[in-house]
Amino acid sequence: HKMIRLVTLSTINGGYLNFMGNEFGHPEWIDFPRQGNGWSYKYARRQWDLVDRNDLKYQYLGAFDEAMIHVVSQKKKFERTPIVKLCENDGDQVLAFLRDDLLFVFNFHPFKSFNGYGILAPTGEYEHILSSDDPAFGGYGLIDMKVKHLTRHDPLFEKDNKEWLMLYLPARTAQILRWKKPEPGETKNASKSKKSAGSIKNENKSKKK
């Protein structure tokens, strides 16, 4: 539920519609009294107390729904920002795209997690701002939200101003990271000091000899 909501919200080019009670996963539908249900009032209600009960899990979905809307609503005219697809791997069931400075990453695989998954992304620093795996949302806390990720230089993609962003993607999780663009001149200096994976491997081979 969390992943589908986020992928829907993050790809909108207009408003985001949610039905009352659906923000926390209300278990019942709404059905007003009519001839077809014998004029019953049984489902003509919303159990608003469910989201406030600590012994149930509705609170987690409600908290996530509120958090993801808050992130997107902080971006002015978010719906007008272009969607830049960075990764779409059907085999791994991984999807990643950028909207302005927000990077959305999804691992829809039901049981396969990826450690150090490489995504070609604009050069810079990325920091976590939301994770569906956060314990506050009923997750396991497998993603370290304090870690800031720096892209890794690759000469093959230097002309496109893209580098490798390595992330841990637990199964069935979604995360949002904020992209911090390099300061003017910072990219050039960083590129000089960084070594590609290939050059590092070659150096290691020469040392062994």
Region spans (language model):
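Carbohydrate-interacting/catalytic domains
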Residues: 2, 7, 11-18, 22-209
